[in-house]
Amino acid sequence: MATTASQIQQLYLVYFGRPADPNGLSFWLSNQSATQETIAKEFAGTPEYKAKIAGKDFAQIVNGFYLSLFNRNAEPAGLNFWVNELNQGKLSTEQVGLIISNAALAQAPTTVDNISVTSKLTAAASFTAEVNKSTAGILAYSGQSGIMRRELPAAGFHHGHHPQRCCHHGFRQ
């Protein structure tokens, strides 16, 4: 079964802390054989992800997943569990991020973690669709030199969103 746009947005949120760029989303949607697991593995090998986790230990990486997904730190028991799994080589960081996000989505829709992730997915889809409306938008948001890397943080955007526009969708910092 092909990976959906929502599943791809989920991976962008987990690994990059931002919505998908239109070209990246289109690329993964056209790759009919790609699963969330294979995309997660690919994302973990990108310069963007490597830069994001550079110099961080497993606890910081796992906590980063919680911050990206839930706007909170990992609870101590959960953090210890994931760090032990990573230290023992049972799981990779890309597997842990995917498992944590999928577990939240598998919870009842009224749980705080599910609401956080689904709200972010809704906002991410809206953001990507808005960017995709113009070539200038696509060029400004895509790639390492894109606007999100330069101007968005300076303008009050965090993780590819603007607090005054998207916080109601769960992108709160």
For each feature predicted by the language model, list its residue ranges.
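Substrate/cofactor-recognition hotspot
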Residues: 1-173
